[in-house]
């Protein structure tokens, strides 16, 4: 079976009071991965990162859960992007 890849553009958001940043994952993690969080391989403008899609307590305006993927400072430096910038994201589940 072919592995599903999620590909989209997202604005990098600043993590308040932590100096970090993240992008939203615009899919329902429970529906897509049958779990509340998922270990993923992500690429931000082609720069690889292994991390997780998680719920950090954020909600969309309609009240639904907003899942996020952290984007490390080192990766932001490599792709020359900061909070407020648009980034191309590719995500796939990792074992």
Range-by-range predicted roles:
Residues 1-65, 83-95:
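Long, compositionally biased stretches
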